[in-house]
Amino acid sequence: MKHKAFFIFMTALLIGSPLYAQKYKIALIHSYQEGYSGAGIVNKLFVKGLKDQQIDFQLRTFYLDCEKYESVEEEQRISEFADSIRSWEGDLIAVLDDQATYSIMACGNPYVR
């Protein structure tokens, strides 16, 4: 009986606990520059989606500014972003738009492999 009561208590405790109790460090990388109209909308929707799911998070946003740089420079910049995220001990990197996605896959940084 004692074990059964303990099992019921632990089950109730686990069911009642949010699965998202951990605070996640999330990096969001945009292809375009800060101030780009679409970036603001995406940032708001991204944050709203996380909050709607009751996910506790800390967000850092990076802007690749792909129209300003050539591919080699973009890959270097995004590799530096990855190093910064690693130092910050980020849990997740979300990449938005084609150019940032290509650059992060091509940069060769071991943190994003």
Spell out what each predicted region is.
Residues 2-4, 19-113:
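Short hydrophobic alpha-helices and adjacent helix-cap/hinge residues
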Residues 8-16:
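Bacterial N-terminal signal peptides
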